[in-house]
Amino acid sequence: MNAFEKMTHQLRETLEQALSLALHAKNPEVDLPHMAWALLINSTSILNQALNKMGVDKSALELEAKSLVDRLPQSSSLTKENIKISKRLADSLTQAEALGVKGGDKFIAVDTWLLANLKEEPLKSLFSKYLDVNELKKNLESIRGGAKIESATDDENLESLAKYGIDLTQKALENKLDPVIGRDEEISRMMQILIRKTKNNPILLGEPGVGKTAVVEGLAQRIIAKEVPLSLQNKRVVALDMSALIAGAKYRGEFEDRLKKVVEEVKKAGNVILFIDEIHTIVGAGASEGSMDAANILKPALARGELHTIGATTLKEYRKYFEKDAALQRRFQPIFLNEPTINEALQILRGIKERLEAHHNVTIYDSALVAAAKLSSRYITDRYLPDKAIDLIDEAAAELKMQIESEPTELSLIKRQIQRLEVEKEALLMEKESTHSEARIKEIQAELENAKERQRTLLAQFENEKAVFNEIASIKAKADELRRESELAKRSGDYNKAAEIDYGKIPELENREKELNTQWNRMQESGTLLKNAVSEESIAGIVSRWTQIPVKKMLQGEKEKVLGVEEELRKDVVGQDEALHAIARAIKRNKAGLSENNRPIGSFLFLGPTGVGKTQSAKTLAKFLFDSDKNLVRIDMSEYMEKHAASRLVGAPPGYVGYEEGGQLTEAIRRKPYSVVLFDEIEKAHPDVFNILLQVLDDGRLTDNKGVTVDFRNTIIILTSNIASDKIMENSDKERRESAVKAELKRYFKPEFLNRLDDIIIFNPLGLAQIVEIVEIMFEGIREKLKERQITLELTQSAKEQIAEVGFDPVYGARPLKRALYEEVEDRLAELILEDKISEGSHVVFDAQGGKIIARI
């Protein structure tokens, strides 16, 4: 067996990488510089692990290795097949084989090859230029740790913990973790479990985003700050990366081998607490036919207390994976993490504010933090605090940073204006000389001069603002770095340095920042192109974008619009002032922030005969609130007359057809949480439908077939019914009519349903005077259709009255009116258009004559 056959997989992969580098550099032979370069660009190689331990910057070494490759002979016509291995490289492999045999290895590993050739040229000159070669040797030997290479994969498991884990205590030492605010009780309970003799493995259970990982980071920070019991001091918290463990495990048993090596390394170290995030992934991880999964490999060590492990997963995954495996479940002690309150979330946001400001180079107002906590809790109901509030702040800051780093809108507009004028000027210069062209060129020249002057002014203002802004950002970054240095100095006992930073350098920077902020405020008074702070409005804008709920503070124009809601609704709905007044009151309460937090904006039952405007009122309301009726969720209750149909609102139960599709009501509101929901002809629905509606009307929430809660607090619920329409028609006296209607309602609906409604509104029967008004509204719709063709229409008063008489029926309300307009107006218009009697620019007048409607052009 020659040296090439005795190489480990890692050394063979390095040689293949070196071959590719030689081909790319057009070198006919693979040589030592190619091997060195291949090892340096492989971030997981043993060489890079050693360099990281030494704190050496490998970028300079990479450049040096590349320059060595560039000096090698080149050939123009090369393929992978005709590249050879140089004699120097072949000899180096032979030397490595001899060194390996001497050390008891059966295969040549990467570190053996390095150790055998570090004192040979060109590797000696390459490494000695930037580091101590003897120290590199010591680090390579310490990574090996005396292990023997007995198989081709053995060198993959050297320093397994460093390769497959992230040292959180090291990150805490370097101040790279965000501060952990609160959660003292949970951290204390976790430490208590870790100190136990056996089964000392806590598992953090909580919904996604409540801060399970942050609690472990908090423990790492306390270990560094020595704020833990004596038995936990000097411990290391290492987060295990399960995906890295599984990735690249090509051969059977390779994953188990890697995990066993990690477990052995943890046992050997004695001071490592292993953290496995999403710990449910260990169940079944790496298992294939005839092999064990990660959970079964870890169980014995967990039970004996040899392995300190902290797990983190959601309650749902814990039930699914752990509760089914009692042997695994009993090895972990659960710690439940509840979602923090708004005030607790606010404290967390204040704690990480400085880090976010330093990252994005912006200022975050405290009002923005308060808005993020409150608005996320109120409107983003499918996620959990503090994660959703942090996301809001982060996205708002990122949006602001993007605006700062881009060209201001005013400058972009002027630039485009200058380009347009330049193009127009060139086009005119190419034309033959004419008086008109010359005059226009002079105009363009004047406009260009003005635009360029304006551009220069704005550019100077922009540069000035950016200079102030960049200096503020630089000061924030420096202050953040100094705080980190101060913390490290305190930990190492260098209190003189810490005092110098805390009482000298940082206050100096803070004073300069105050001066710059004062300067910035003065600039803002005269109007700035840049905005440097995340405000309450920024957060509201992000919430609106995520949820389609208009959360932004009302501008004056919108306030006027809301105050005029009743008049706006009356434009489309005639003769129902009482109904429109009740709807308007509910909208005003909501817009003023006075509506109840745990109920829909409003819930109404519209009663009245057919054709009086019940459904039209709902459509008009949706159009008013959203400028279109697309946010009207209309559910025809005649489709829900059978018992089995009621489940379609929330979705079919598991095992039934349509389970995956979800509910027709719940899915519609999940997509558009700010909607008008119309339950048309509610009296036709099966009684089970009312049981579903009770929860919506009372709590503003509904749970669908998958157990997901859907929020109805931003909806307006409207139910329409023809119940007691005969009583409404018979009684002209308001009090008698209302008592008759209430008596009729009690026969159809349960008291608990009626009591949950905000208002029961009776729509009045329409009279001839109201029908005439409706004729004008409907005729306006016909006008709109012909506006594009520039055909104008006019309807005389006598024609309106004639159509109203033809289309009026007290029993059917305004519905026959549409048919009357079709027959008397639209049919005539269609004939005139098809006969080419009217065309663009025509004016058509409809009038009544001799009891008939005539058209005059």
Swiss-Prot record:
GO terms for biological process: cellular response to heat. Residues 85-146 are annotated as: Repeat 2. The keyword Hydrolase does not apply. Residues 558-765 are annotated as: NBD2. One of its GO terms (molecular function) is ATP hydrolysis activity. It is found in: Cytoplasm. Gene3D superfamilies: 1.10.8.60, Clp, N-terminal domain, P-loop containing nucleotide triphosphate hydrolases. Residues 340-548 are annotated as: Linker. Residues 766-857 are annotated as: C-terminal. CDD domains: AAA, RecA-like_ClpB_Hsp104-like. Residues 390-525 form a coiled coil. Its main location: cytoplasm. GO terms for cellular component: cytoplasm. Pfam families: AAA (PF00004), AAA_2 (PF07724), AAA_lid_9 (PF17871), Clp_N (PF02861), ClpB_D2-small (PF10431). Residues 7-72 are annotated as: Repeat 1. ATP 1 binds at G206, E207, P208, G209, V210, G211, K212, T213. Keywords: ATP-binding, Chaperone, Coiled coil, Cytoplasm, Nucleotide-binding, Repeat, Stress response. ATP 2 binds at G608, P609, T610, G611, V612, G613, K614, T615. The Clp repeat (R) domain probably functions as a substrate-discriminating domain, recruiting aggregated proteins to the ClpB hexamer and/or stabilizing bound proteins. The NBD2 domain is responsible for oligomerization, whereas the NBD1 domain stabilizes the hexamer probably in an ATP-dependent manner. The movement of the coiled-coil domain is essential for ClpB ability to rescue proteins from an aggregated state, probably by pulling apart large aggregated proteins, which are bound between the coiled-coils motifs of adjacent ClpB subunits in the functional hexamer. Homohexamer. The oligomerization is ATP-dependent. Part of a stress-induced multi-chaperone system, it is involved in the recovery of the cell from heat-induced damage, in cooperation with DnaK, DnaJ and GrpE. Acts before DnaK, in the processing of protein aggregates. Protein binding stimulates the ATPase activity; ATP hydrolysis unfolds the denatured protein aggregates, which probably helps expose new hydrophobic binding sites on the surface of ClpB-bound aggregates, contributing to the solubilization and refolding of denatured protein aggregates by DnaK. This is Chaperone protein ClpB.
